[in-house]
From Swiss-Prot:
This is Zinc finger protein WIP6. Keywords: Metal-binding, Nucleus, Repeat, Transcription, Transcription regulation, Zinc, Zinc-finger. It comes from the Eukaryota. Residues 1-78, 245-281 are annotated as: Disordered. It comes from Arabidopsis thaliana.
């Protein structure tokens, strides 16, 4: 306790007084007994006794942690690939795709770097850098590789859901939103007439619709993956036997069957995307040769 503008320590108890002084002010030092309880989290300077009888002690705490916590709120910079940990795209970004690249001359926007670069060729020879300029940089689209949360309320991938978890990247989020929250314009042209939101899902379903996958033990399955799991689980005496001419029951599959079907259809979506990228790389070289020969690019494509 303090007595007559002097301080003393009673036993092992520490006395701490919050400072009201301005930051950076230098206080004269006083003789102070060493506390028997060292502080690992904070430091306290010597208390100052002024002529008015008021004792002031400056409290100096450690700096805050260097790790920045992203709340995903109003901090827009928290959504960049350099600082952010996840991304919550808006509904328009999910349906249309985020615009990543802009022409520096006319401000026309593109969602692919190579399309923007080829568009700029039409603005003059100073922008013509050859086919290699179409490849762009990896950092320009790094935000598309961030884990994404769904913006739909009530979705298990929404950040406010009690058991929420992010999706792998932006493309996975787009497919998820179409499947779970979007319209289903694709209808099976066979007897079941089941509807789908993703074209790849629809194609895969029609390819296998009406088929049963049989095991030699007599069990039948609607999905080839289920048959493989059955054979792997029971081992000897079980093997695949396919019958493709038999029509199975009509109606919606149960939830487990739908999840198995979606896992198979993810592979189809990735194959379609890879084929599209390969065709695009070939077309870029053809378009560049066409531009060098005729000096123009169709505005319909760009």
């Amino acid at each position: 306790m303090y007595n007559n503008n002097q301080y003393s320590f009673s036993g092992d108890e520490d006395s701490v007084v919050l400072s009201l002084g301005p930051p950076g002010q230098q206080y004269p030092s006083h003789n102070k007994p060493t506390s028997t309880k060292p502080s690992s989290d904070h430091e306290f300077n010597h208390p100052l006794t002024n002529p008015n009888g008021v004792t002031v002690a400056l409290h100096i705490g450690p700096p805050s942690s260097d790790k920045e916590t992203l709340s995903g709120g109003n901090n827009q910079e928290g959504l960049t690939a350099r600082q952010g940990q996840y991304w919550i795209p808006s509904l328009s970004q999910i349906l249309v795709g985020p615009t990543q690249f802009s022409c520096s001359v006319c401000n026309k926007t593109f969602n692919r770097f190579n399309n923007m670069q080829m568009h700029m060729w039409g603005h003059g020879s100073q922008y013509r850098k050859g086919p290699e300029s179409l490849r762009g940089t990896k950092s320009s689209s790094s935000i598309l590789r961030l884990p994404c949360y769904c913006c739909a309320e009530g979705c298990k991938n929404n950040i406010d859901h009690p058991r929420s978890k992010p999706l792998k990247d932006f493309r996975t989020l787009q497919t998820h939103y179409k499947r779970k929250h979007g319209a289903k314009p694709f209808r099976c042209r066979k007897k079941c007439e089941k509807t789908f939101a993703v074209r790849g899902d629809w194609r895969t379903h029609e390819k296998n619709c009406g088929k049963l996958w049989f095991c030699v033990c007599g069990s039948d399955f609607k999905h080839k993956r289920s048959l493989k799991d059955h054979v792997r689980a029971f081992g000897d005496g079980h093997a695949a036997h396919t019958v493709s001419d038999r029509v199975v029951g009509i109606g919606d599959a149960d939830e487990d069957d739908e999840e198995e079907e979606e896992e198979e259809e993810d592979d189809v979506e990735e194959e379609d995307a890879h084929e599209e990228n390969v065709r695009g790389e070939k077309n870029y070289g053809i378009r560049y040769d066409h531009f060098r020969r005729y000096g123009q690019i169709s505005d319909d494509n760009y």
